[in-house]
Amino acid sequence: MILQYFKKKENKEQIIAIEQYKKILAESNLFLNENNFFKIKNYKISFEIVSIFLIMFIRINLLKNNRKLYLKVNDELLSLFISDLDESLREKGIGDMSIGKYVKSYVKKFYFRISKFPDDNNLYKNESFIEYLKLID
């Protein structure tokens, strides 16, 4: 997945969201490429990893002191994610006529994953997180 860089006027929330999204992509790529957990490395696996990291960042943002600011940051993060989905699917060769259908299906998958993600923020040896990972496999 490749981050789109926007050339429009950016506000504080957009700047924070862009920096966080860059971190999400960097950590996701590092996790995907530095581990041998995955038999195959394709777009689906990349989507799942980015989704998990994005959900964790959204959760962390909700714990921050300035909740009003970080709610807007989360909105910007989701906008960046959807734009990135669109761009990366186009790069895969999906045409303009069907791109909306694919983006919509991936966004639905992401929101489903949010609803099933464990409530506990400590994911180490967390049984519900292990069940979540089995669910998305």
What are these model-derived regions, one by one?
Residues 1-49, 59-137:
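Surface/interface-facing alpha-helical segments and adjacent flexible terminal/loop regions used
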Residues 54-56:
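Generic transmembrane alpha-helix motif of multi-pass integral membrane proteins
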